[in-house]
């Protein structure tokens, strides 16, 4: 369960980073 939460957190961070990059660029 902990691994799943960690994976989701990493995915959310990556998604936010991509989203910010797209908005900036």
Curated annotation (Swiss-Prot):
Predominant location of this chain?
Answer: secreted
Q: Which GO terms describe its molecular function?
A: hormone activity
Keyword entries, A-Z? Behavior, Secreted, Signal
Question: Per the UniProt entry, what are the Gene Ontology biological process annotations, in alphabetical order?
Answer: negative regulation of female receptivity, post-mating; sexual reproduction
Compartment(s) of residence: Secreted
Leader sequence segment: 1-16
- In terms of superkingdom, the source organism counts as Eukaryota
**GO CC annotation:** extracellular region; extracellular space
Role noted for this protein:
Responsible for physiological and behavioral changes in mated female flies.
What protein am I looking at? Accessory gland protein 98AB
Tell me what organism the protein belongs to: Drosophila melanogaster
